[in-house]
């Protein structure tokens, strides 16, 4: 699912398909151990994913690896994934949930805003060597 997301929306992630395509099964397993991963399915096929875990020291969680397959967009899949990450973060005892979204990804920003996320004003480069910015969004839990 991660590789499909990187191929379809390389502009939306802090990594690339080329960097991740040769990962071993053990590397994939280790990458998800510390996070709760959600997969949305339709007719047995994965159509979306998101993960939630600790943002760092403190009581904040973070949403990462959020992606919905193009044919499933606009059908409530993104809303379901946001709700799942929020509930997971609450259950884990986080006081706040953070995420980063590419600055010009208006559809994603509107999705998060519908669920109470707000821009914090913080920005960072999407990845080294890429001049695009992503902005941080936050939701109090």
Locate each region found by the language model:
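Acetyl-CoA-dependent GNAT
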Residues: 1-71, 82-84, 88, 92, ...
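Internal amphipathic alpha-helical segments of the cytochrome P450 catalytic fold
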Residues: 60, 74, 108-109
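C-terminal "cap" of GNAT-fold acetyltransferases
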Residues: 95-98, 102-109, 114-141
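Flexible nucleotide-binding loop
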Residues: 75, 79
């Amino acid at each position: 699912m991660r590789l499909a997301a990187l191929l379809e929306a390389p502009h939306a992630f802090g990594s690339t398909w080329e960097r991740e395509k040769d990962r071993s099964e053990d590397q994939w397993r280790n990458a998800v151990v510390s996070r709760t991963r959600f997969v949305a399915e339709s007719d047995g096929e994965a159509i979306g994913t998101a993960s939630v875990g600790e943002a760092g020291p403190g009581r904040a969680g973070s949403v990462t690896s959020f992606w919905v397959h193009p044919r499933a967009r606009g059908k409530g899949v993104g809303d379901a994934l946001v709700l799942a990450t929020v509930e997971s973060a609450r259950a884990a005892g986080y006081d706040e949930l953070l995420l980063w979204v590419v600055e010009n990804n208006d559809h994603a920003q509107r999705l998060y805003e519908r669920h109470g996320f707000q821009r914090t004003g913080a920005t960072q480069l999407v990845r080294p060597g890429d001049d695009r910015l992503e902005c941080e969004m936050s939701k109090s839990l």
